[in-house]
Swiss-Prot record:
Pfam families linked: Aminotran_3
Annotated GO biological process: protoporphyrinogen IX biosynthetic process
Catalytic activity, EC: 5.4.3.8
UniProt record similarity statement: Belongs to the class-III pyridoxal-phosphate-dependent aminotransferase family. HemL subfamily.
Gene name tied to this protein: hemL
Provenance organism: Thermosipho melanesiensis (strain DSM 12029 / CIP 104789 / BI429)
Name assigned to this protein: Glutamate-1-semialdehyde 2,1-aminomutase
Keyword Cytoplasm (UniProt): yes
Compartmental location: Cytoplasm
Catalytic activity: (S)-4-amino-5-oxopentanoate = 5-aminolevulinate
Pathway this chain belongs to: Porphyrin-containing compound metabolism; protoporphyrin-IX biosynthesis; 5-aminolevulinate from L-glutamyl-tRNA(Glu): step 2/2
Keywords carried by this UniProt record: Cytoplasm, Isomerase, Porphyrin biosynthesis, Pyridoxal phosphate
Subunit note: Homodimer.
């Protein structure tokens, strides 16, 4: 199937990580999925810790979501007009995400971030933006940059086709480095339109913020009249019903959302203070539009997902308990191999470098070959991890204690076989 796919699609995939290139395997092709499990086209079944990269917090094909999609599909799949689900979703987001007073739906996290940055530039009438190395905010040109050689180095393209001139307005800072971001603002503060950050980094593995890191960003952006944007595409409704901003009690000016709020269908949203959001067209001069924005199928899936979460008071407690059990089990099983597990709620990643991992430099020092061995071994025993050492595992509401224990048991077998030279 992969060879055929490569005839018609670049690299045989529609998103690079799906190619399994980082783990040096051909990708699996999914036939079906239910709950915590997926089945490939050869009828092999796996416990799935990808869960559509965190979008499926209820698990695959949850009855509530499927019923909502089926019901809406009978009423229409797309209108290009206003409909009640848009208002219902907006109200849920405003009532639960502390920073959001008004919100606009879009079709992806990339689109949400792109629009939020345009809005921040319009509001501040400044051009420069600050992002952090290791944080991913979609594939818009201004954010496809790497750090360069110095703390204050302006961005250089990290993708062919992105011009140096375009990303010259992007400053790349060091994640979790308070001194570095202070220096950036001392030098460029009056030029900075916004700072965008994953409040919990989730695209270089899971890297939680150090104490006072987010608060420092909040204080600096207020001092210099810049906009603070939290990219909560992963963390929104994942780590708490109030997102990471509620978890850490640091409230940004704008927030981007995605994944969970779409119930597994394509989605994005950005929102924030009314004063800022009222600049968006048609109310204001900042243009943003989308044919499928607020799509009724997506919002049916999303609203049903969020209602399920909000109506189950022990929802996050269950996820946390499952994730904690997995964290402790992996630490014990792989304790002889320099493993470090990072976890926030139901987001987990592990690194093989024997030390705490709280910066981009420490992330990339992890033993990627060890991860490849682990991935291949787990896959052979029906456990599907992310096919990259720098992505998060996600626990869903559908995962069971049995799933977690089976995963830990396989980790124990891997450890034993590795010691005996059988892996």
């Amino acid at each position: 199937m992969f060879e055929k796919a490569k005839e018609f699609m670049p690299g045989g995939v529609n998103s690079p990580v799906r190619a399994f290139k980082s783990v040096e395997l051909d990708p699996i092709f999914v036939k079906s999925a239910k709950g915590s499990k997926i089945k490939d086209i050869n009828n092999n079944e796996y416990i799935d810790y990808i869960q559509s990269w965190g979008a499926l917090i209820l698990g695959h094909s949850h009855e509530v979501v499927i019923n909502a999609i089926n019901e809406q599909s009978q009423k229409g799949t797309s209108y290009g007009l206003c409909h009640p689900l848009e208002v219902e979703m907006a109200q849920i987001l405003v009532e639960n995400i502390p920073s959001i007073e008004m919100v606009r739906m879009v079709n992806s996290g990339t689109e949400a971030v792109m629009s939020a940055i345009r809005l921040a530039r319009a509001y501040t009438k400044r051009d420069f933006i600050v992002k952090f190395e290791g944080c991913y905010h979609g594939h818009s040109d201004s954010l496809l940059v790497k750090a360069g050689s110095g703390a204050l180095t302006f961005g250089t393209p990290n993708s062919e086709g992105v011009t140096k001139e375009f990303v010259s307005k992007t400053i790349v800072a060091k994640y979790n480095d308070v001194q570095n971001i202070n220096e950036i603002f001392e030098n460029f503060g009056d030029k900075i339109a916004c700072v965008i950050v994953e409040p919990i980094a989730g695209n270089m593995g899971v890297v939680p913020p150090k104490p006072n890191f987010l608060l420092t960003l909040r204080k600096l952006t207020k001092k210099y009249n810049s906009i603070l944007i939290f990219d909560e595409v992963i963390t929104g409704f994942r780590v708490s019903q109030n997102g990471a901003q509620g978890l850490f009690n640091v409230i940004p000016d704008l927030t981007t959302l995605g994944k969970v709020i779409g119930g597994g269908l394509p989605v994005g949203a950005f929102g924030g203070k009314k004063e800022i959001m009222q600049l968006i067209s048609p109310q204001g001069p900042v243009y943003q539009a989308g044919t499928l924005s607020g799509n009724p199928l997506t919002l049916a899936a999303g609203v049903s997902t969020l209602k399920f979460i909000l109506n189950n008071k022990n929802f996050y407690k269950k996820l946390d308990e499952l994730a904690k059990t997995l964290e402790e089990g992996l630490l014990y099983a792989l304790k002889d191999f320099n493993i470090k597990v990072n976890r926030v709620g139901s987001m987990i990643s592990f690194f093989f470098n024997g030390s705490s991992v709280d910066t981009y430099e420490k992330v990339i020092s992890s033993d990627v070959n060890m991860y490849k061995k682990l991935f291949k071994y787990f896959l052979s025993y029906g456990i599907l991890l992310p096919p990259s050492p720098f992505e998060s595992l996600f626990i869903s509401y559908a995962h069971t204690n049995e799933d977690i224990q089976q995963t830990i048991d396989i980790a124990m077998k891997f450890s034993k076989n590795l010691k005996e030279g059988k892996v």
